[in-house]
Amino acid sequence: MRAVAAIYTDCPGVDWTLYFTNKGTNETPVLEQVKAVDVMVAPATNSAAVLHRLRGSMCGADDWQPFDVPLAPGAKNEFGAINGRSSADSPFFNLDWGSGGVITAVGWSGQWRGVVERNNDGSLRIQAGMQNLHVRLRPGETIRSPRILQLYWLGADQFHGCNLF
């Protein structure tokens, strides 16, 4: 596996893509459940956590409408593409823990899945990747993960993070 990453020096952001290459002479074992991002954050405060999201596009009047998902301890929110339509859900989301947050973007035009959960200890976990990945790589073959961007922000205003780029 190889990771290609960019760390932004003018804002608190990082993006990366993972590459898997079979450099052997036989097929690889099955590659599945690859999470391009699997990050745990533990905010210093135990304030309310809110996931700010956008509806996807299903050709309706509420396309791309913002909405919030409160995350109580033990709560989990799963979302993603439907039937290969990557626009059926927005791949951009902002996890807000009151004193800051992180904006995550999933760059993938196929079937993707995201999960944001709040553990009982107050920590928050963000996961995203290709849904239903189940492949073997032949010698010389390479596949890549979705490109992930994360931008961390401080303060109580969720829109502050949106304007850091």
Named regions from a protein language model:
Residues 1-122, 131-133:
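Polysaccharide-binding surfaces and accessory modules of carbohydrate-active proteins
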Residues 135-154:
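Short Pro-Gly-centered flexible turn/kink motifs
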Residues 151-163:
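Short, Lys/Arg- and Gly-enriched loop/turn segments at beta-strand edges
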